UniProtKB/Swiss-Prot annotation:
GO cellular component annotations of the record: plasma membrane
Effects seen without this gene: Deletion or inactivation severely impairs growth in encapsulated and unencapsulated strains and leads to the formation of spherical shaped cells.
Function, as annotated: Functions as a peptidoglycan terminase that cleaves nascent peptidoglycan strands endolytically to terminate their elongation. Involved in peripheral peptidoglycan (PG) synthesis.
Catalytic activity, as annotated: a peptidoglycan chain = a peptidoglycan chain with N-acetyl-1,6-anhydromuramyl-[peptide] at the reducing end + a peptidoglycan chain with N-acetylglucosamine at the non-reducing end
Annotated site residue numbers, Important for catalytic activity: E428
InterPro entries: MLTG-like (IPR003770)
GO biological process terms, semicolon-separated: cell wall organization; peptidoglycan biosynthetic process
Domain of life: Bacteria
Recorded name of the encoding gene: mltG
Membrane topology recorded in Swiss-Prot or TrEMBL: Single-pass membrane protein
Membrane topology (Extracellular): 209-551
Name this protein carries in UniProt: Endolytic murein transglycosylase
Subcellular location: Cell membrane
Keyword Transmembrane part of the UniProt annotation: yes
Length: 551
């Protein structure tokens, strides 16, 4: 074969290699798009490097390949493909055919260079070769066609860079699998952890809201009472369980935790009337007060009667009560009941000592029971009626006067007379000291058959007692009014009290301060009372401490 033929064969082989490398490069670009997740390890050469190295290796082999002597029998020199085939390890010759040795090898008479071993590639990426048929006619094939012998057909094989690159890519991707799996595990862990945090946060929020909701009243609009008994020696947890069963708290355990957190440790045993409108804080405060030994009827409202109130004022106060009572508690019903003679007769029979001197029907008293209803605070229950309420007030007066009944009798006074004097003392003086002195003045005037001359009685007769009266109005009262309560004209006491006196006024009227005073006048602007034992001094006190304030 001529030099030109060899060069052409080399160029043809080189072009084939380049075409194959171009195909590998195109396939590599497709793989890069499809397998973007898989990263080529840092130490694996890229496709471009493989192409460049392979091309340089082929050129070096072509350049350094020695000239093989022509076979004596064929005269066809070995082709470069033969050299590459001999260089590739692990490719066995055809065992089924015995290839005869050349005459030169048998005789050894012809001198010439020994067998030339091609230089091993300096860089191998895969040691497993792939044999494929080439697209051109090799020198061996030409010799086979020219020679008389029919050698065993052989398929010329070369390393296919594309398969090599593909296997290299697959083999290079294998180490990345653990990284991918590890990355997946980390990602799963992070997601699980975030989900856990989200659930924890949501659980904490809803748990906090549940606790707050458990501390609120069961029914904020409920007015009903629930009677609960707390046994002696019950701890906070047991009390919480009892309240939960009674429907007063939503969760007994939360109640006990809250009680400990707020340091409510002094909860007392007993019977309690509690409401569903109470919060946990309200319930704990109520349990600190202590219950009763026996169950009591729930209190729906409280009624406070101030000291010195008249029956008209008491009736108006009762009419302001609101609640789900057994019967309607109105001012009209109250006034009708205190004037009911049947009811009065029953009361006299029930409280004989208190009511034995009660003003008679034709005494001129506006209300026979005026002054007999003790001023205090009363509990209004579901079963409370007008009659039961008045009876409770009479019972309170009887109870407070019981210690003084014998003393009143020893002073030659009736209960009605004492209460009448006390009703005037209640309004004329504000301090206990003054009340005792004023009571002494009244007794001195009574003992001398002098009219009491109290403006309080005149105001009651006019229906103005209890109203805001100015100093000018007080001075200008009608002392000539035709009324049994006109103590300017009438000597002695009125038919009965004009208001409900306080216990202090009652005691001051029983234990009056003795003196020779017959007059008194109060400076309402200063709250000071001036006393005198003669008319001249009294007139001077009036001019100085009352009339001077009118200008």
């Amino acid at each position: 074969m001529s030099e030109k033929s060899r060069e052409e064969e080399k160029l043809s082989f080189k072009e084939q290699i380049l075409r194959d490398l171009e195909k590998v490069k195109g396939y590599d670009e497709v793989l890069k798009e499809d397998e973007a997740v898989v990263r080529t390890p840092a130490n694996e050469p890229s496709a471009e490097e493989l192409m460049a190295d392979s091309l340089s290796t082929v050129e070096e082999i072509m350049r350094k390949a020695p000239t093989v002597p022509t076979h004596p029998s064929q005269g066809v020199p070995a082709s470069p493909a033969d050299e590459i085939q001999r260089e590739t390890p692990g490719v066995p010759s055809h065992p089924s055919q015995d290839v005869p040795s050349s005459p030169a090898e048998e005789s050894g008479s012809r001198p010439g260079p020994g067998p030339v071993r091609p230089k091993k590639l300096e860089r191998e990426y895969n040691e497993t070769p792939t044999r494929v048929a080439v697209s051109y006619t090799t020198a061996e094939k030409k010799a086979e066609q020219a020679g008389p012998e029919t050698p065993t057909p052989a398929t010329e094989t070369v390393d296919i860079i594309r398969d090599t690159s593909r296997r290299s890519r697959r083999e290079g991707a294998k180490p990345a699998k653990p990284k991918k799996e590890k990355k997946s595990h980390v990602k799963a862990f992070v997601i699980s952890f975030l989900v856990f945090l989200a659930l924890l946060s949501a659980g904490g929020y809803f748990g906090y809201q549940y606790v707050l909701d458990s501390l609120l009243p069961i029914d904020a609009n409920s007015k009903k009472y629930v009677t609960v008994g707390i046994p002696e020696g019950s701890n906070v947890q047991e009390i919480g369980t009892t309240l939960e069963k009674a429907g007063l708290v939503k969760h007994g355990l939360i109640f006990s935790f809250y009680a400990k957190y707020k340091n409510y440790t002094d909860l007392k045993a007993g019977y309690y009337n509690l409401q569903k409108s109470m919060s946990t804080e309200d319930l704990l405060k109520e349990l600190q007060k202590g219950g009763t030994d026996e169950p009591q009827e729930p209190v729906l409202a409280t009624l406070t009667i101030p000291e010195g109130y008249t029956l008209d004022q008491i009736a108006q106060t009762v009419g302001q009560l609101q609640g789900d009572f057994k019967e309607s508690l109105t001012a009209e019903a109250f006034l009708a009941k205190v004037q009911d003679e049947t009811f009065i007769s029953q009361a006299v029979a029930k409280y004989p000592t208190l009511l034995e001197s009660l003003p008679v029907k034709d005494s001129g008293a506006r209300y026979r029971l005026e002054g007999y209803l003790f001023p205090a605070t009363y509990s209004i229950k579901e079963s409370t009626t007008i009659e039961s309420l008045i009876d409770e007030m009479l019972a309170a007066m009887d109870k407070n006067l019981s210690p003084y009944y014998s003393t009143i009798k020893s002073k030659n006074l009736t209960v009605n007379e004492l209460l009448t004097i006390a009703s005037l003392v209640e309004k004329e003086g504000a301090k206990t000291e003054d009340r005792k002195l004023i009571a002494g003045v009244f007794y001195n005037r009574l003992n001398r058959d002098m009219p009491l001359q109290s403006n309080i009685a005149i105001l009651y007769a006019q229906g103005k007692l209890g109203q805001n009266i100015s100093l000018a109005e007080d001075v200008a009262i009608d002392t000539n009014i035709d009324s049994p309560y006109n103590v300017y004209k009438n000597v002695g006491l009125m038919p009965g009290p004009v208001d409900s006196p306080s216990l202090d006024a009652i005691e001051s009227s029983i234990n009056q301060t003795k003196s020779d005073n017959l007059y008194f006048v109060a400076d309402v602007t200063e709250g000071k009372v001036y006393y005198a034992n003669n008319q001249e001094d009294h007139d001077r006190n009036v001019a100085e401490h009352v009339n001077s304030k009118l200008n």
